[in-house]
Regions:
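A solvent-exposed interaction/effector surface
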Residues: 1-164
Length: 164
């Protein structure tokens, strides 16, 4: 599993947020509809606000059920990362993220399957065999590269962690 641990300073996630049900496999139609409802110009505006890592447009989940039960509601934020000192436009939701350690997992392949398989492998393989555990905070997906039709992609899954 392609993984690295990063010590990241405090930052904020800003963007457009919605409550959606958690779906474990396949595309989440609620998230797809939400993203499609945003004008293309809004995606471009968000990109111009990003000034820290993780870079680019991000898929953020927050407020997830601790047991990750399918069908439970979570907050999905379509946005970008900005430095803690940056000011966000008033029309955007903000998730403040404290400084801390992150496990960053890279996935390549069929989208969203390769990403979902990586999620599952973190719980079933990586966490049980490493001295880290999840800490409170959002989960972040960064799309590093993708096919034009989005059937394949290279992604990074950022999970907040602390030493076990």
């Amino acid at each position: 599993m392609d993984t690295r641990i990063i010590d990241h300073p405090a930052f904020a996630l800003i963007g457009h947020a919605v409550r959606v049900p958690l779906i474990h496999e396949g595309e989440n139609p609620h998230i797809r509809e939400f993203i499609e409802s945003l004008p293309t110009t809004e995606h471009e505006r968000l990109k111009t606000l990003s000034d820290t890592t993780p870079a680019g447009l991000l898929q953020v989940t927050d407020g997830v059920d601790p047991d990750y039960r399918e069908g439970t509601d979570l907050t999905y934020l379509h946005g970008v990362a900005v430095s803690a000192a940056a000011s966000a436009p008033a029309d955007l939701a903000i998730v403040d993220v404290p400084a801390g350690m992150w496990a960053v997992f890279t996935a390549h392949g069929s989208y969203p399957k390769a990403l979902q398989d990586t999620w599952a492998a973190t719980a079933g393989e990586w966490f049980p065999s490493n001295p880290w555990r999840l800490r409170p905070g959002p989960s972040i997906v960064s799309i590093l590269d993708r096919a034009e039709d989005f059937t394949t992609a290279t992604t990074e899954l950022w999970l907040p962690v602390e030493r076990d």
